[in-house]
Curated annotation (Swiss-Prot):
Belongs to the Cdh family. One of its GO terms (cellular component) is plasma membrane. HAMAP family: Cdh (MF_00319). It comes from Cronobacter sakazakii (strain ATCC BAA-894) (Enterobacter sakazakii). Keywords: Cell inner membrane, Cell membrane, Hydrolase, Lipid biosynthesis, Lipid metabolism, Membrane, Phospholipid biosynthesis, Phospholipid metabolism, Transmembrane, Transmembrane helix. It is a single-pass membrane protein. The chain crosses the membrane at residues 5-27. InterPro entries: CDP-diacylglyc_Pase, HIT-like_sf. The gene is cdh. Pfam families: CDH. Pathway: Phospholipid metabolism; CDP-diacylglycerol degradation; phosphatidate from CDP-diacylglycerol: step 1/1. It catalyses: a CDP-1,2-diacyl-sn-glycerol + H2O = a 1,2-diacyl-sn-glycero-3-phosphate + CMP + 2 H(+). This is CDP-diacylglycerol pyrophosphatase.
Amino acid sequence: MKRALLITVALIAVLALTTLVAWRYLFPHDPDALRHIVMQQCLPGERERQEPAPCAQVNLPAGYVVLKDINGPLQYLLMPTWKINGVESPLLLSDNTPNFFWQAWQARRWMSEKRGSPVPDSAVSLTINSRMGRSQNHFHIHISCLRPDVRAQLDAAMNAIGSRWQPFPGSLRGHDYLARRVSGEELSRRSPFMMLAEEVPQAREHMGRYSLALAPLKDGAFVLLATQRQLLQFNLAHSEELQDHDCALLHEGTP
């Protein structure tokens, strides 16, 4: 009887999640919209007229663009200048590929420029969603504010976060995450995608199932967070869930 109940609950969970995924695919936004903006507008404008619009920045030598997202007053996206679909791309594990997370952290300055006053680093976070957890098929890192409750959890767990991957104490937004402390120096020279693929067992073979997030800690280091798709736990590996595009932290004062 107990086994039958567990099977029934599992089937209901799978059905609910399948319905959610099907809805996303049956009623999608254009999954190539970001790629069209980058390839058909930002890059030609920069090359022909030195005008990156609608992007805020096009850095051809470094291989990235920065675009203001339509959601939230301060959210920006960092994207490559060539075709990379997302976190599952083998290109992200090549030594020849730029360190997009480090570039995105440098690009946080656009948040302050848009706001007209400094956005403290403690309010900033970076995320990239998994293959199933995203709506766009052009690689993009979300540069946006951190949720206040997530900021509080990171502060409380700071001393428990080590330099090796380990489960984050408790959960974040109801989902399990791995956490790893990263220094600024390490972040500048080593891609978080490499850290995940080389240090978490079997991650290299299943990169598309993972979502990554990065946020600063109070002691000057960073915490790198990773969550893996778990359908029975309603987790699509959408670490953007840790962000608050309305930036309540800034309304509450300097975090």
